[in-house]
UniProtKB/Swiss-Prot annotation:
Xref: CDD domains: SIS_GmhA
Gene: gmhA
Cell location: Cytoplasm
Name by which UniProt lists this protein: Phosphoheptose isomerase
Domain SIS: 50-208
Amino acid sequence: MEEQGRCACRLEDRPHYEEMVLETMLYSARLKERVARENSAVIVAMSRLMAETFEGGGRVLFCGNGGSAADAQHLATELTIRYRSSVQRPALAAIALSSDSMALTAGANDLGYDAVFARLVEAYGREGDLLVGISTSGNSQSVANAFMAAQERGLKCIALLGGDGGAMKGKADLEIVVPHTGSADRVQECHIAIGHVIIDLVERMLGYCTSSR
């Protein structure tokens, strides 16, 4: 008897796993290429906005849920600690709002989860700061509410979205929508690649990076 939700296929019944690997990774590469070609100017604009935020003494706040929370923490850490060992620079002030489990659980319990990031923006956000919201569907209400709180406080907003952009499309100062639906994984791969390019460009714009790649 098959376990509920488990495919009846077995390892020996599936001789084409290598083709699946190739197909998956080539699709991911093509999707990244499409996003790069369609959004290169936006990525540069995002990088410039972030660099200007740091140069002006501001901070960059990140938020997202699930895998997007992991991306938020990943990128914030690379800004604060280090992106590449070949680049020597001061720490850049970046905060992942998803990293404080006590604040998240207290906010979810006392205010409702959709209000958690907005509350943290109220606590930490100041005019001249920048909020980066990440949502693979574009429908994360907690991130959308954080944008509203940020804009009320004079923060600029960047959105990394997926699918058709969802309810968050058009709500940020700058946005990129990864045109993939049906799963979050390929969108997440593009989001982290975009984030890495932005950090690289920010370091260059601030005069810290001189390497070619």
